[in-house]
């Protein structure tokens, strides 16, 4: 994965990253993470589907390898309650101050509805509401608010991270890309060609009104003895 955040396109640096967890048991990854940092990787990004959850590999990495920035790419907006979502994000941000970014997205009908039994409805609104709630909760305020897709009554985080984590939105279509630019710190993209990434950057930076936004792009590589 690459994160474009003040010397690549649009003045943002390129940060090479790797998807985690790597093969093998989680408890065996300490040396592998250090090797990634030694090789020049700056970020690691977790996912959440049918294997490890998104937070546990990053919590281990936070303790094992302080050189790496940590991010989720992504946590589904549907599969945690609002309060639990905020608690998980705040805990990771507290474990790795200034090194954690939370990526949130709609995920898919298979993961949300078929595997978790949650209706996969109004994905744009759901992601938007989770982003807005996280911004409210991570700011330390007591949240009593009715969002379009859920409501929260009197929740205040009992843990306030030293550094508020960046919030990134997984997006492919223009509506979600503009949401990421307007209400989050950037976007996470997947399954796109280099030419598509250029077009995505134009949409995101155009909607950001001059505010720098990070673009995290997942790149699939198939290494072999011939490459």
Predicted regions and their residues:
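Active-site-adjacent structural elements that line small-molecule/cofactor binding pockets in enzymes
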Residues: 1-227
């Amino acid at each position: 994965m690459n994160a474009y955040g003040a010397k690549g396109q649009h003045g943002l640096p390129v940060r090479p990253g790797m998807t985690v967890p790597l093969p093998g048991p989680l408890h065996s990854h300490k040396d592998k993470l250090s090797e990634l940092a030694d090789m020049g990787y700056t970020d690691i990004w977790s996912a959440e589907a049918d294997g490890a959850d998104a937070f546990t590999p990053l919590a281990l990495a936070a303790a094992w390898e302080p050189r790496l920035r940590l991010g989720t790419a992504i946590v589904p907006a549907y599969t945690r309650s609002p309060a639990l979502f905020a608690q998980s994000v705040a805990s990771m941000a507290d474990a790795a101050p200034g090194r954690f970014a939370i990526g949130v997205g709609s995920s898919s009908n298979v993961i949300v509805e078929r595997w978790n039994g949650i209706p996969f409805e109004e994905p744009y609104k759901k992601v938007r509401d989770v982003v807005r709630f996280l911004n409210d909760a991570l700011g330390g305020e007591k949240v009593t608010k009715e969002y379009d897709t859920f409501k929260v009554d009197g929740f205040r985080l009992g843990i306030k991270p030293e550094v508020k984590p960046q919030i990134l939105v997984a997006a492919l279509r223009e509506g979600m890309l503009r949401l990421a630019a307007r209400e989050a710190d950037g976007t996470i993209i997947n399954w796109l060609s280099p030419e598509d990434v250029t077009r995505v950057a134009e949409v995101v930076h155009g909607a950001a009104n001059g505010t720098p936004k990070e673009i995290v792009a997942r790149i699939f590589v198939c290494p072999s003895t011939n490459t």
